[in-house]
Amino acid sequence: MTGPARSGAAIRGAGRTVARGLIFLIQLYRHMVSPLRPATCRFVPTCSQYAVDALDEYGLIRGSWLAAARLAKCGPWHQGGWDPIPERPGCRVNCQDASDAWAVRATRGESGSLV
């Protein structure tokens, strides 16, 4: 691999590294600072979990944009509630298959179904 293809891969790799660094900083906040403050997030998942999920799923640029947009919604002017990261196009889950996944029998010492 040479030329533009190689530099594109290097940029994506650097973006992943920076995204992982941001996730680490968010996790530090979640485990060190957040427990010292009262729970005030009006969203599920919380804004910090949303940011981790967005960075993990979409990478540095789009994940940061999604996290910033979510933080901009955080305030008394928004009702909050369920607000997951958007699905990637073409990654829809079949609801029948998803409900069947909860009914799988536990094996080798794993926990059983929650439902």
Curated annotation (Swiss-Prot):
Alphabetical list of SMART domains matching this protein: Haemolytic
GO CC terms: plasma membrane
Subcellular location: Cell membrane
Entries under Pfam families matching the protein: YidD (PF01809)
Record InterPro entries: Membr_insert_effic_factor_YidD
Keyword annotations: Cell membrane, Membrane
Domain of life: Bacteria
Primary location recorded for the protein, binned into one broad class: membrane
Membrane topology value: Peripheral membrane protein
Protein family: Belongs to the UPF0161 family.
Function: Could be involved in insertion of integral membrane proteins into the membrane.
Protein name as catalogued: Putative membrane protein insertion efficiency factor
Organism, as annotated: Mycolicibacterium paratuberculosis (strain ATCC BAA-968 / K-10) (Mycobacterium paratuberculosis)
Lineage: Bacteria, Bacillati, Actinomycetota, Actinomycetes, Mycobacteriales
